[in-house]
Design a protein with these regions (language model features):
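Conserved C-terminal structural/oligomerization subdomain of aldehyde/semialdehyde dehydrogenase
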Residues: 33-36, 79, 86-219
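Flexible, acidic loop-helix segments that line cofactor/substrate-binding pockets
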Residues: 5-13, 29-61, 78-86, 102-108, ...
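Short, small-residue-biased leader/transition segments that mark boundaries at the very start
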Residues: 1-3
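Residue-level signal for inorganic ion chemistry
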Residues: 17, 28, 66, 107, ...
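Short helix-loop capping/hinge motifs at secondary-structure junctions, enriched
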Residues: 20-25, 97-101
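Cytochrome P450 fold signature focused on the C-terminal beta-domain
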Residues: 72-78
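Short beta-strand and adjoining strand-loop segment in the mid-core
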Residues: 13-20, 91, 179-180
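Basic phosphate/pyrophosphate-binding loop/patch that engages nucleotide-derived ligands
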Residues: 64-70
Length: 219
């Protein structure tokens, strides 16, 4: 899909255990060079243009800020007209998710390596952002995945698969905190979003009391 970088559940931050972080970074670089940015009507295109000038300006400002801070990055090398809305995918190594201010709807990936002993603190930092739509974990240690699932404040949790593609009626979709508005779309509780509760309270004593109860008492 040509909007893969701007789906609400698209990957924005990847956390990689430090033991394999450098190897993963090198693989990521190779994979990124295969990405094709261009006309979304062409089957060979992976990523199309950013939606408007305001959006691409915000993304470019974020990229410029991280580059100015001297962050290590990898980027594809296609050239585009400066007036176009096309943008090369780019990945930055950063130290903490705290360095990201708000959502970045575009082809920007933030790469963070971590120590296993820091996992609990990592989850706390993620929760502290206030956003909680999707999270994915790749691990063969199911107890560790369960630990993350229990602590992470996210609406959709994926294990050993991609993090997009929720299907209405099969997998309810929705987030928590700043990423949620209540019941999940596609789930049984979603219907409650379309109804309004209404209560009726009657002071029966004002009209002489409840006739049925009074009659039963007389019996």
């Amino acid at each position: 899909m040509c909007i893969r970088d701007r789906r609400c559940s698209a990957l924005r931050v990847v956390f990689v255990q430090e033991d394999i972080a450098q190897e993963y970074w090198e693989y990521l670089n190779e994979a990124m060079q295969e990405i094709k940015v261009g006309d979304p009507q062409k089957p060979c295109t992976d990523i199309g243009p950013i939606i408007n000038k305001t959006s691409i300006s915000k993304l470019q400002d974020h990229v410029a800020k991280l580059k100015k801070q001297g962050k290590e990055f990898i980027e594809t090398k296609e050239e585009f007209d400066k007036q176009s809305f096309f943008m090369n995918p780019i990945a930055f190594k950063i130290d903490s998710i705290k360095e990201i201010d708000g959502e970045k709807f575009g082809p920007i990936l933030h790469f963070i390596s971590y120590k296993t002993s820091e996992l609990d603190n990592l989850i706390n930092e993620i929760n502290a952002t206030g956003f909680g739509l999707t999270m994915g974990v790749h691990s063969r240690i199911l107890d560790k995945a369960k630990q993350i699932f229990d602590k992470a404040n996210v609406g959709n949790f994926y294990l050993n698969r991609d993090i997009v593609g929720a299907v209405v009626g099969v997998q309810p979709f929705g987030g928590q905190g700043l990423s949620g508005t209540g019941p999940k779309a596609g789930g049984p509780n979603y219907l409650h979003s379309f109804v309004t509760e209404k209560t009726f309270t009657d002071n029966v004593m004002a009209t002489g009391g409840n006739i049925d109860l009074l009659t039963k008492n007389n019996e």
